[in-house]
């Protein structure tokens, strides 16, 4: 057994020399135990810390529109910032594992605030089947997987269907974003979600239009 472990460690070290794992933000080689981003970049990650603020800006986006207990986002996405590479590589670079890693980081930090208390199920914002076939995965689902790894809360990817393949929301105004996502989601299994407290997970939050469209499917489910 010891010999097997030594061989695995040796192979891992050898492969790291040939193909070093690098921080997706700064490009420096990752140290042992680091994932996705190095410790320095993790410390400097522009966190919102909204989970520590009642009536935070994310929660205010949805006031008066859907029943909401709490909402947050992990870090600020700023144009020109190196940290944008995290999401760019997750969405367009085929690096789905970044989603799981960032989901774990986020969940670990939110645990102490009891943000996940009472949540029964996680629903990642679904992609249209054509877009998911092209990309090969749903990045929001991978973020949700990371959250599940820390919290143990199950994921539901079947109860809500994205029935329209919409244009990208980039460069659209608030009204255009709302029009673009109106009626794009369809509830498939209301009986499964009855009486459940649901966490909706998306990769990027700007105006909240997509999240709102998804959540609107749930407002008539009994007991939500």
Feature locations, PLM:
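Glycine-rich phosphate/pyrophosphate-handling loop used in enzymes and phosphotransfer proteins
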Residues: 1-202, 206-224
């Amino acid at each position: 057994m010891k010999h097997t472990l030594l061989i695995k460690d040796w192979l891992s070290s050898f492969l790291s020399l040939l193909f070093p794992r690098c921080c997706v933000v700064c490009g420096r080689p990752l140290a042992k135990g680091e994932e996705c981003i190095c410790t320095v970049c993790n410390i400097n990650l522009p966190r919102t810390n909204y989970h520590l603020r009642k009536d935070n800006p994310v929660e205010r986006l949805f006031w008066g529109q859907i029943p909401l207990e709490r909402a947050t986002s992990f870090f600020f996405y700023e144009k020109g910032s190196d940290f944008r590479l995290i999401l760019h590589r997750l969405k367009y670079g085929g690096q789905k594992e970044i989603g799981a890693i960032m989901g774990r980081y986020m969940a670990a930090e939110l645990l102490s605030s009891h943000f996940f208390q009472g949540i029964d199920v996680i629903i990642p914002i679904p992609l249209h089947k054509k877009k998911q076939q092209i990309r090969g995965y749903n990045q929001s689902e991978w973020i949700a997987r990371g959250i599940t790894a820390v919290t143990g809360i199950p994921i539901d990817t079947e109860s809500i269907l994205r029935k329209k393949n919409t244009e990208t929301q980039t460069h659209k105004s608030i009204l255009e974003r709302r029009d673009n996502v109106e009626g794009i989601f369809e509830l498939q299994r209301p009986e499964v979600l009855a009486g459940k407290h649901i966490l909706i997970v998306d990769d990027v939050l700007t105006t909240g239009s997509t999240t709102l469209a998804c959540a609107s499917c749930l407002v008539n489910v009994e007991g939500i």
